[in-house]
Amino acid sequence: EHTIVFFWRQNRPEQLQKSLDRKFNIVLCPRLPMYLDYAQDTLQVHGVDWRKFSCNSYQKVYSFSPQDIPVKYPKNCNILGIQANLWTERIETEDRLDYMLFPRIAALAENAWTKEMNKNINSFNIRLKKQFDLYKKDHIYYSDPFTPKETGEPVR
């Protein structure tokens, strides 16, 4: 009753199924797309080269659904929500941290509070572009997925 499972191994859906069957509380944080230390796009060159597995773009974070994991969800399952993880052993500066988080953290937030039937990536893109002025105002070094060459990747 007090156990919370953080499910991150999307390649092992049978483990999620066991947790669902045992009625554990579950937070979904699958590596693909919820590991924010993975590259955001193919232009990234520094740090761990996760591109051989996947780029975890803001679009993938935004569009992630529990239904992407092939399990049988009980009618009243205990999915508490979703979470993204950012492992920082290779992040040495605040700019690098910001770059890896933003705008994917905005995509995560909107994914978490928006019902599946109301998600619309085009509408989100309009709102996201407006966030960039706020990021600049707060000196957040973000990755601009619309013009990625204009927001160069920090080396570390």
Label each residue range with its predicted role.
Residues 1-156:
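Substrate-binding groove of N-acetylhexosamine-processing glycoside hydrolases
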